[in-house]
């Protein structure tokens, strides 16, 4: 499989966020949040079993599609379900700890694959392991008593969901999600190339930039989850977004491996909790419409497919990864510009 096909398959996952987010919101209103999450787990588990039963290109594509569907449904339904389990004061911290678990899974994936490489099934043994973990999570949730609030009985539609953008805070946070996901994907593309360009590292070693980045995000999500249980989300957002911007500027001027990895790690720490904060504040602002808010914000995740091609054009035009970093820094200024709005947002539309 050539690089173009591989890239298209990877980017296709963002298509599911665009297509299925709002229909998942509709499903939540019909069968409830908990059942929607259980369905997402079931689809994910089936997707993990397909490569075990038959491993060829066509079946892997089917598995990848099912994985994208399950992931989209989970992303839309899980955070609103959390609002039925924890208080508003602990919502941001709880969502952030969830991001920590997600980051840990991403970080451990390659390590587990390497561990299983010497087994009978080889690295593909990771699929039944992931399927088993998913089934356990599904069973645990299925038997857990959760009292869901019937806060919105009217039917969710595409028009009703997009009408939330009439609220200035929701539209600002929606754009914030676009920026966060776009920059995250852009970073993943840019870091290895930056290390190749400035440190003359071979491609296989240049991937350490992403490893450092994901490790920093994992640590940052854990620390953020603990801190956000006790301290103001708006102050944490201010510090994190400014730290990330300083890190991007530092990367632009860094020329040696140590400094590049330092600023990559610093950016990961700054980035780690911003998605959770925006998501939490959006749901707290419209607590009667959390299903629609969640669906709309997850539509914004599809924006991750927009920025990387633009970075490619800019890099080809100027012939340096520094131009991509400058572009990312300029885009990131939006997150800093959100600071006063994050400070002023009030639940239930009572903003200043």
Regions found by a protein language model. Name each.
Residues 63-100:
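Cytoplasmic helix-loop-helix junction between adjacent transmembrane helices
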Residues 167-211, 218-221:
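Extracytoplasmic gate region of multi-pass secondary transporters
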Residues 11-25, 211-223:
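Central cavity-lining transmembrane alpha-helices of secondary-active solute carriers
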Residues 19-58:
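Conserved MFS/SLC helix-loop-helix module at the cytosolic interface between two early adjacent transmembrane helices
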Residues 35-49, 235-250:
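Structural signature of the two symmetry-related core transmembrane helices
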Residues 92-111, 298-308:
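Glycine-rich segments within core transmembrane alpha-helices of 12-TM secondary carriers
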Residues 32, 53-58, 232, 254-255, ...:
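Helix-breaking motifs and short loop linkers at transmembrane-helix boundaries and internal kinks
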Residues 97-146:
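Helix-loop-helix hairpin linking two adjacent transmembrane segments in secondary transporters
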């Amino acid at each position: 499989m050539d690089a173009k096909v591989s890239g298209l398959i990877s980017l296709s996952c963002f298509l599911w966020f665009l297509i299925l987010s709002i229909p998942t919101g509709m499903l939540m209103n019909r069968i409830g949040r908990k059942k929607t999450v259980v369905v997402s787990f079931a689809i994910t588990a089936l997707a993990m079993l397909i490569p075990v039963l038959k491993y060829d290109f066509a079946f892997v594509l089917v598995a990848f599609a099912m994985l994208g569907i399950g992931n989209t449904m989970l992303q839309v339904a899980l955070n609103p379900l959390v609002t039925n389990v924890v208080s508003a004061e602990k919502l941001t911290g709880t969502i952030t700890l969830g991001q920590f678990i997600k980051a840990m899974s991403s970080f451990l994936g390659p390590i587990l694959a390497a561990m299983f490489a010497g087994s009978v099934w080889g690295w593909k043994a990771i699929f039944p392991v992931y399927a088993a973990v998913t089934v356990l999570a599904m069973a645990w949730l299925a038997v857990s008593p959760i009292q869901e609030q019937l806060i919105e009985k009217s039917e969710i539609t595409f028009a009703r969901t997009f009408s939330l953008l009439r609220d200035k805070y929701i539209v600002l946070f929606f754009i914030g999600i676009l920026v966060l996901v776009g920059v995250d994907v852009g970073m993943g593309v840019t870091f290895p190339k930056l290390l190749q360009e400035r440190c003359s590292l071979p491609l296989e070693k240049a991937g350490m930039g992403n490893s450092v980045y994901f490790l920093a995000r994992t640590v940052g999500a854990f620390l953020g989850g603990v801190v956000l249980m006790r301290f103001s989300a708006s102050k944490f957002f201010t510090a994190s977004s400014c730290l990330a911007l300083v890190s991007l500027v530092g990367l632009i001027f860094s020329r040696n491996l140590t400094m590049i990895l330092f600023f990559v790690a610093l950016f990961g720490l700054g980035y780690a909790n911003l998605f959770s904060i925006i998501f939490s504040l959006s749901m707290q602002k419209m607590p009667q419409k959390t299903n629609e808010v969640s669906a709309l914000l997850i539509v914004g995740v599809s924006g991750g497919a927009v920025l990387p091609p633009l970075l490619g054009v800019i890099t080809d035009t100027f012939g340096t990864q520094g131009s991509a970093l400058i572009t990312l820094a300029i885009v990131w200024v939006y997150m800093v510009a959100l600071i006063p709005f994050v400070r002023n947002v009030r639940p239930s539309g009572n903003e200043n």
